[in-house]
Amino acid sequence: MVNMAAPATEHVRNIVLVGQDGAGKTSLAEAMLHVSGRTPRMGTTHDGKSYLDYDQEEIRRKFTLGTSVAPIPYHDYKINLLDTSGHPDFIGDTLATMQAAEMALFVVDAVAGPQVMTTKLWREAEGMRLSRAVFINHIDREHANFDTIMAQLHARFGSRLGPVTIPIGVAEDFKGVIDVLRMKARYFDQDGTTDDRIEDIPAEYAEAAQIARDRLCDLVAEADDDLMMKYLDGSEQLTQEELESLLDKAIAQELFIPVYVGSTIIEQGIRCVMKDICTYFPHPRHHGAFRLANGEETFVDEDGEPAAFVFKTVADPFVGRLSYLKLISGVLTPSMELINARTGKKDRLGHLYVMMGKEATDVKSAKAGDIIVVPKLTDTRAGDTLSQSGTMSIDPLPLPVPQYPVAIEAANKKEEDKVGTFLTRAVENDPTLRVARNEQTHQTIVTAMGEAQVETLLARMKEQAKVEARLVPVRIPYRETITKTAEAQGRHKKQTGGAGQFGDCWLRISPNPGEGYEFSDEVKGGAIPGGLIPAVDKGVQEAMAEGFLAGYPMVDIKCAVFDGSYHSVDSNEMAFKTAARIGFRAACEQAGAILLEPMATMDIVVTEEYAGTVMGDIATRRGRIVGTDSTDEGETVIMVRVPYAEVISYPKDLRAMTRGSGSYYIELEGYDPAPADVTKKLVEAYQASKA
C-alpha cells in the first residue's frame, strides 16, 4: 500500500473531475472510493450521505458547490481526486482547482451528452495544456446511446478522442465493457466491489473492438517518430508492449484522449478507469511548466526548495481557515516557515492534513506533486505562492470577472457590522466575489457570478455567522445636470427676537460638461464679505448633492456668485449656506435640468444560433449594437452600448436565452441624458417618497 502521507512524486495522480452539473462527477468519486475500499459504502448526493458533498448547502441543493478532495490509495499509487462544481456560478473554484491537477477527467452523461459547461471547461483545459480523458456515465439509463455520444464528442472536441472501453449492452442490458487496450471483455459482478470477470470478446463486438483498437494505435503511434513511420507504411503493427509503453506519453502530449464508459450508480466500469489512472495517466512531473510572475518557468521538482501554490481557501466552522496547497517542489513538514510572495510575510506551518471530504488526517510530511491542506494561514488566499525563499511567485490563472450585482443589507440594522465582517471573509475565500460600498446610493453591493452563488452566500451567512441578510433592489446611480445658463437670487431672512439670520446672494449656473463642479467669486465692491463666500460654495454643493429633479446628485455645473447683500449683525455662515441653497434651486428652475443615466458597454459572446435573439433583446433594452466580431472558436461577439439599468439582471437573462452557453463582459462608460419616460417615472417615485 502506498504511503498516503508522503508518496513519491511519480506515484501521485492528481485528477480533477469536471463537467456539467448532474453528469455524475461526485458519484464517480464516491464509486472510486468504495471500489478501492477507502469507504465502507458508496456515498450518494441525493440522500445527503455523500462523503464529498458534506456542506449543508450542498446537501440541501443536491449538487457540488465547491471542490472536495478524495485521496485514494490504490495498489502502489495515491490518487488525489478533485471533485469540482459543474454549476456556472461556481466556475471560478473549478478553474482554480484545475491548476492543481495533471489530468482532467470529464464526466459526460450518456443521455444528455456534452453540454455547455463541458465545452467551457474543455476549452479552459486546452488553454492550460491539461491532459484530458472522458468518462461516459449512466450508460445503464433508458435512452443511453454510446455511439451517439461518441459522435457528439468527436464533433465538438475533435478526432483525438478514442474509446478504450466499449459497453456490452446499454440501458438495462448493460453488463460489461470491451477493454480495447487489452482486447478482452470485462463482465461485472452485482455491486462492483469484486474484480471484473475477464473473457474473450463476444463475436458481435469483434468488429467494433478492432475499429477502436486500430484508431487507438493510429493516435498512440504518433508519440514515437520511428514507430510511427514503420506503422504508417504498413511494414509493422504496434505490438501490445509498444502500445502500452507509448500510451502514457500519448496521453500526456494530448495526442490521444481516452474515453471510458460505465455507470457510477451501480459502480460498473470503474476499475478500468482506476487501473489506467495509475498506469497511463500523467504524474506531477509530466505537468507543463508553471509560469512565474517574473516571466520565468518552474517545474515540479522533489529536490527543489520547499514551495507550494494555494489553489483554494475555506473557512471551516470547526477547524477554522484551511488552505489547499499543491506542492511544486521540495518537502513540507510541520513547523516549517514559508514566505508568502504576495505579502512578504512569513507563515509557520502547523499541522499538515490529508483531507477526505471534511475529514482531516494529520501527516508528518508531504512531497512535491502532492496535495495537502494546512490550517490557520491567516493572510493566505487562493492564488498565493508560499516558498522558503519567498522569491517564487506562480502566476495564478485569470478567473472570470463577476457580472451579477445585488444589494445586501442586514435584516436587523444593528447587525450591519456582522454582515460586513462575513462578506469580507467570503471574498477572501471566493475570488469570484466582489464587495463594495456605493457611497452615492449608500448600499453594499455584492457582485457575483449568478443567483445560486448569492443564495449560497446568504445561506452560509445565516448558518455560520448566525446573522440574516436580505436582498434589496440595486439603486441605479443616476445623476442630474443642467442644459442652460440661468441666474437667480437666494435670500434668507429669519428674525426670532434675538440675533437673526440674513443672507442674500445672486448665483449664475451654467453647464460644464465632463468637467465636474467649478465655483467662482465674481462679487464686486464687498457686497458679500470675502469670509462668507466659502459658505455660499458649501451651500451650492449641498444643494447639488440633494438633487433637483429626483434626488440624485448633480454634476458638471459651473456656479458663480456675482452679487448680494449682508447684515453686519445677522449675516453668518449658516445664513449664507441657506441662501445659496435657495438661490441654486431657483436657478435650476430655469436651467433645463435633466436626468442622466449610467451607460454600459458590453461584449456578448454567443454561438451563431443565438446571435439574432440576443441582438433583438438588446434592442428592447434601449441598447445599440456598435459592432460584431468572431472568436477563434467561431462564436459571435456582439458589442453593444446600453443603459446600465436595463442589464442589471442580464446574467440570468442571457443564460435563459442561450441555454447557458452565452457569456459577456461589461464596463460602465459615462452617462447619457435619460429619455422622458424614464425621467417621469423616477421623478414621480421621488415625489411620492416625500409625500
PLM regions with names:
Residues 1-691:
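Structural and coupling elements of P-loop NTPases
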